């Protein structure tokens, strides 16, 4: 329960908090000033085996979006990351480590390309929005940067695709890995990506508008009973086993991309710093 926390703009509930509390959440963490469920009635080990066999519904609203749009949106995103985004297609997701002037990792979001001049950065636990605003101002870039009203809901596990295909139709199966499409929820179009913080397969639904969140949760929960659905959260055993690091835990500002990732990175705003780190790593 979140009874021991004083809710404010610094610690925010989500559209799904009432649902996870009713389902027996045993604790929360705070990520990006928002509640993240951390444990339910089952043990971490039992949760691990369930996730590998069935399907779970996760409240990951704490994955806040930093929206960058405008004529210089692409240039600003490229300025922040060593990942070359020039060939990214609309409808594609990219993992894009964000670095500072010394090649230290500031964040490791997933980039969603909504249009040629509009991007979402689905962030880990640091204030990337402020960094983006500072760079845009300092470089004189024409870009609008803000946090949209988006609350991701994750459906993870080997039964996730079957559940979502039953609810939203077979076209769900055509969405490729790290690609996204659109589904109808309560008369609105909502973005759904084949992605998530597990290695068991699944999707993330980026719910635009908090009012649509509870209804979507209830819809998936009812349909999920046939698939042995449970509430869940990122599982420590499963994500480490799958090589999914957590910013703030396994990597921080003190690390550079060459210490964390196997593949090379190129075309950096701070190429001198990266090259220095490459030689030392």
Please report, for each region that a protein language model flagged, where it lies by residue.
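Conserved, structured C-terminal
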Residues: 1-32, 36-39, 111-281
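Acidic, proline/glycine-enriched N-terminal capping motif
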Residues: 1-96, 104, 232, 261
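Short amphipathic beta-strand starts and helix->beta connectors
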Residues: 44-53, 98-108, 137-140, 184-192
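Internal amphipathic helical hairpin motif
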Residues: 71-107, 160-188
């Amino acid at each position: 329960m979140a009874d021991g926390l004083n809710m404010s703009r610094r610690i925010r509930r989500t559209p799904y908090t009432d649902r996870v509390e009713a389902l027996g959440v045993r604790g929360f963490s705070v990520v990006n000033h928002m509640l993240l469920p951390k444990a339910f009635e089952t043990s971490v080990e039992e949760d691990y085996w369930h996730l590998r066999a069935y399907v779970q519904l996760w409240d990951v609203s704490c994955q806040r979006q930093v929206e960058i749009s405008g004529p210089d949106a692409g240039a600003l995103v490229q300025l922040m990351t060593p990942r070359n985004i020039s060939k990214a297609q609309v409808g594609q997701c990219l993992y894009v480590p964000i670095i500072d002037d010394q090649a230290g990792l500031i964040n490791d979001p997933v980039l969603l390309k909504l249009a040629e001049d509009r991007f979402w950065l689905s962030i880990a636990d640091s204030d990337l929005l402020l960094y983006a605003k500072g760079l845009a101002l300092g470089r004189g870039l024409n870009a609008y940067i803000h946090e949209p009203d988006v609350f991701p809901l994750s459906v993870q596990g080997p039964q996730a695709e079957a559940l979502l295909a039953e609810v939203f139709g077979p076209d769900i199966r055509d969405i490729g890995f790290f690609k996204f499409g659109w589904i109808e929820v309560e008369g609105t179009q909502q973005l759904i990506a084949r992605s998530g913080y597990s290695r068991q397969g699944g999707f993330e639904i980026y719910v635009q508008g908090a009012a649509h969140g509870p209804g979507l949760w209830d819809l998936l929960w009812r349909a999920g009973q046939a698939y042995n659905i449970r509430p869940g959260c990122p599982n420590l055993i499963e994500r480490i086993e799958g090589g999914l690091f957590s910013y703030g835990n396994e990597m921080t500002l003190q690390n550079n991309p060459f210490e964390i990732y196997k593949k090379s990175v190129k075309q950096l705003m701070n190429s001198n710093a990266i090259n220095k780190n490459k030689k030392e790593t």
